[in-house]
Amino acid sequence: MQHPRMFNQTSTNAKKPNGSDSSIKVANHSNQRQMSANHASLTIGGSRNPINQRRSMSTKNIGSTLIVSRRNNHYLDMKEEDSKENLTKIISNNQNEEDTEVSVKVSVWFHELRDFTEDIIIDENVIPTGVQAGQVFELQSLDEGSSKKFVFTVQKRNLRSATNDTDYTEASKPKLQISLMANPFQRLLDLAPRSQVQLKRLVKLESVTVDSVEIFIKDVNLSRDAMWNFSASMIGNCVYIDQRLLYLGSRVGVTKHIYKNGKNVTSGYVDKNTKIIYRSESAKITLFVQLSREMWHFEEDGEIMFHKLINNLFPKIFRRWRETNTHHSITIVLFTSIDLTDIPWTNLGPGQRPPQRRDFFRVVVDQVNSMHWDRIMEDLRLEFANFKRDTMLNLDDDGKFIIENGTLPAIKGNLLEAVNLGLTSLNNRFQNTDLKHSISHIMVITPGTGLFDVEHDLLLETSKKMSSVDSSLDIICLSQPPLHVTPLFRYIKEGKVCHCVPLWCDISFFIDKVQQESQWIPRCKIYELQMMGVMENEASDARIPRLHLNNYGKTLVEIMDEYDSAVFKPIKRIPKPAQVEFKQVKPKFQAPELKNATATLSLMFENKPLLQPSNSSTISLATGTVANPSKDTSALSSLYYINKNSEEIKSPAPSVRSETPVSTIRAIDSYRKSAGSPRLIRGETMFKRKEEIPNTEPPSALSEKNAASARKKSSILAEPEQEISTGSFWIEISNPSQETTTNVLQRSQSSRWSNIFPNKIQRKLIKWRSFQAPASLPTTTGVFPSTNQLQTDYTFQIYTVFLNSDNYWELKSTHSLMREMIQLRLMLGFQVCYGERVDKAEAERKPSGNVDAIIKYFPEEHNYLGSRIYLAFGDEIHRIFCDYNGNINVQLYRKIIENDEKKITLGQTKLKPYFPLIRTRYTDEYTPARIDAIADNPQKFNWNQFDQLLAGFDDAMPEEKKQFHKMKFVVMPTDIPKNAYFVSNEKLTPEEIRVEGLRKLIGVIERGKYKHDSSQKKKSRRGSDVIFYTGNLYDFLNEEAQNYDITGTQPALMIPESSRFNKTIKLPDLAQELQDRNTGLTLVDRTWHFKRHLHCFVGSELVSWLVDCFEDIETREDATTYGQNLMNKGLFKHVESRHGLLDGHFFYEFSDEYVDKTDREKPSWFGSKKIDGASTPQSNSSPRIAGQNDLQKIISASNLRSETSSTTDSMGRKRKKFILSRSVKFDVDPLKKSFRPEFVTVHYDRVHNPEHCYHIRLQWLNATTKFIEDTITAWTRLCERHGLKLVETPWNELCSLPKLSPFHSFVDIKLSVNPWTDPDLCDDRILSSNRYYYHSYFLKQMGYYLDNRSTSFFSRENIDIGYSWGKPTFRYAQFIHKTGFYIVELRDNGDFFLAPNNMHLTRVRSSTTLVGDYENYSKGVLADSQTVMLNFRAACQNKEFLKETFTLAKSNWKDDYFSQII
């Protein structure tokens, strides 16, 4: 059938004036030339006759050749005897130019980035039919021996006419047909400029569609929902090697590998079935090194295991990281397990471990950049030399060191315990957000052979955790690979030794030397042979007879050749004696009898009434109520017996005869419906012959060659095969020596990580790519339960979500809501399910099942109605469906907790609390961990609450659970740069520059508020809403409270619209208005650094007043100019006569001739005042300055005499509550690059002392992290220009970090001189006013700024302090070093708790934009950070220095020098 658009064109040209017809026609163009018969001929098959020799064609170049419907691989290959009818059919199809593959010969040009920003520029007329956006072309060199092909999709921006440099190209490159970016295409395609290439338009894209694409990302935290959206944007486009990819206008990654049919290709086309894999070159890697007994053994070549690690493996890994310029954050931990029993470990049986063990973990480096490989190697060698001594020596009662037993071998070690300990920092997905690193990866290096004895319960618990986090695990073995399948876990269950291969980890074997296939490698260690010398082999007592191979022995090469030849042989049928037949077996689980035919779950069947959402009592509406399945109803029971009649339900198994033993039947039945822990994929076949028949085949019941045939022949075999292939944690192996790795890999496709492996690619012995760039958990998966599993193993719940038009997330349509619901799940670990099982489950749904409506990626807005998507995570499956009325239905399937699992999770657990001994980086002793690594489980979420929250119902989730992604920043003083902010004709002090910079930063935040309508603009743009003060915060707030009247109302600054002024007002009148107590400025006595300025105002407040009250002043700049004119006329002046009018925190006073004398006679704010009968002494702190109307004070209406009231103090006085921070919905995407609103909640302090840290906190749920990172970078640059430093710090207090991250380094430090007990320093006047005066003075001398006050500070007398982000809960006062590298806590007993600020260190080391030489700069940062810690610890231990410092502090003491902070 012809395309309608082309049919009219062809019909017009079909007939000539003379009535003759033509076989093939091409649309005429304006510039045509007649071609010779030989040139214009089209040869098809063996036909020698030219077709329409007088045909006219249009070409761009004279030498161009037109080939119609021809492919390189000769899809069109017709013989001479082909009928004329077939030929006519082909020619008729070619009349549709849209479906015709056209090839031309062109010259390729190359351009630089300065010429064009696009990778490809193509002329629309390069082919006669024209080039249109969306078409796919293939470019191939005509040089012999060059097979590289480049496939690309034409976008509108790639067309030559769409470029802005058309005139330039016409002048410099008039014959340009196609131009490629010189870098990388010239190297990638190995083409010289002006080379002749063949350009072919492709119609059938199957030949160029790729199977998988690997994208490497670096220095960006690309969340999984962003990966899903990014993958969706790539569908329908082409990719090529080393292509730089952009997402929402920002560069996020580079295409490194493209696979098709098991081969690496240069480029290809991406469709919805292409697997897109993301690997991170800036990951967080936790590397465990197991120092078991074998680590001190040596190989057959004499190399000690640890030397093999430290001299071979680590250097190669670091070298690859350095060559690829990766920016990983590395944590290296040494661990081992010490046997405390007197039983030799060799007496332990398979699967057994010593009952009494002591585990040790030594942190070598903690979140250090991978560039510091030299320092890491040095620390590793040092720690290895001391590790055995530190772990095996123990003090006895007599104070002597004794050796406690020995180190366990790797097979009996604590591998799973180490994995659980590494997962503790990953269980909470919302804590410690890192915007520079994507993906967390765990690597375990062991000297073992890949066989580990474990406890079954611990293996199950670890498997559950690994299936609930998106972190991968690599095990690297230093030994030779064994002859059995690996990794192999061995455990005892019900008295039986079991073997299994976990699906959540991968294993590698490091072999340094290249070995030949014929070389024999010993797999076992014989001590006598290892200790023999070269000349001792004749005299040795060990006599080992030579191994004589039997005649039937085959080499590995022969076995592989035999396997390859057997692949294409016909499938063998199972012999007659091997057929299995069974009696009728009644299944354990049957469809329950439905007592109520109108129940919700029963409404979905053919024989039941259709589902009625409007009147179903169990379907949630806006309130989010979920359906509670009955006690008798397991899983989907009634829901998923769909399209089946009652007979099928009652008898799911076919009728068979009784030729199989009863034990086998019981085993099958038990296997199908086992209540055991995980669904185990068994390596052996489930059925055996009744009579064993000798056979030369391998000793398995059914070989792999006829297993497929057996499954096809028997439905009883096929169904269990479907059931056991999903939801599994491991593959059970009956005989590890007989199981091949290939078989295990084929059955391991049920792993949720299976999509990262390209099809038909041979797995290598060591996975260097995984070490170089760990892979992210794929956003899609083919793993899905069978229909039978959904019926029996899952419970079902349903609720409906409606969009509230007034919602915080600015969602305007159900389309946006559904997309956000999917993205939130992907971000928290879910995967999109696809495949035959998903289609089957959807097809059997009644009445709304529609396979064609299942989506893998989100559709366009006009196509989303009726779409449904399946997502899976752990033991949950979510089906999100948008009906045609715009309502979103969410159906949740949760796996039933089976009996063995209930014993662990609900009853008395078999797993003991696990608190191993950990020694962090800077500590000297091993101390017990502060977190139970095994009991700590990943965070679970109430998805009904989440969905209702996204829909706009804020009360659906409690406030304490709304702590999502969060970051905390502090702004600290630093050196003034040379290009610092300045004001013309003004000389600002460093403090004034910093204060102005802080005001500008808050101004940027205020101006960046998310706007619903960008056209709405307010005339009045008030300045920064920050109140500056010096001295004691409590005294300042107490005086602020005195200035509020008893009702809590404040005088309005704005005067009525009818009383607005203009610039014609006279100075005396303006002076009177400015000094009016109700509508004028606030004239108070202000103190700054112990110097008092009477009756003054702030410059920024005057500017705001002028903007608000003058009708002819529109901007703050106009107000500043007008105010300067007033100052020049003598209306007011600077308090120190140093500045003109500046829109900032500068003090001014009225000239004497304009001062209102009546106002001066009134008492000052700083005089003694009475409030509720209590006197408050005069203070040196400054009062409110600007924006005071937003500083909230809440007076309780409760009984003033109530001692328990939170708003009254012990004396019955009314307590004033102050909110010292303000929250702003900040737009991080002001240029609207994203398809959705992108904003975060910013909390900033409204009260600030320039000598302390200023706080900015960010909170968000679903914003794109790249926009947040760009915003923080812009803030950092602004701060640097004003002598400020923006430093990221932990959200929680420092003392809680060891509970959140057990490997985080910290140091407990005591002062060698205690100022509280030293007779020369103990002064009652000082200690009574401020107990921690000496400690504060010492910290200030060491360069530390106050970060957070202790909670006790905020509960004093009649002041109640809160923040917009919540109530402060810091137990101790916290200080940050001026570099931002270290944080110190001041404990109640006067000791210090010091820890590195890893967040800031990671951010600084990852900021490659700061300097060009990244490696040297990063190493300098590491040296500086360690120097800070070493200097502080040395100062605390130096008695002379402390005595001198404390003596100086005592001599400089003043009553108000330091504020009370504890």
Curated annotation (Swiss-Prot):
Got any disulfides in this one, which pairs? none
Per the database record, which ranges form the DEP domain? 1077-1152
Annotated GO molecular function terms are: GTPase activator activity
| Cross-referenced CDD domains | DEP_DEPDC5-like
Q: Which GO terms describe its biological process?
A: intracellular signal transduction; negative regulation of TORC1 signaling; positive regulation of autophagy
Keyword terms: Membrane, Vacuole
Where does the record place the region Disordered? Answer: 1-55, 688-717, 1166-1185
Q: What does the record say about its membrane topology? A: Peripheral membrane protein
**Chief site of localization:** membrane
One term under GO cellular component: vacuolar membrane
Query: Which InterPro entries does the annotation name?
Result: DEP_dom (IPR000591), DEPDC5_CTD (IPR045838), IML1 (IPR027244), IML1_N (IPR048255), WH-like_DNA-bd_sf (IPR036388), WH_DNA-bd_sf (IPR036390)
Where composition is biased (Polar residues), the residues are 7-55, 1175-1185
Under SMART domains, the record lists: DEP (SM00049)
Its localization reads: Vacuole membrane
Q: Which family does it belong to?
A: Belongs to the IML1 family.
What is the protein's given name? Vacuolar membrane-associated protein IML1
Source organism per UniProt: Candida albicans (strain SC5314 / ATCC MYA-2876) (Yeast)
- Lineage of producing organism: Eukaryota, Fungi, Dikarya, Ascomycota, Saccharomycotina
Q: Which gene encodes it?
A: IML1
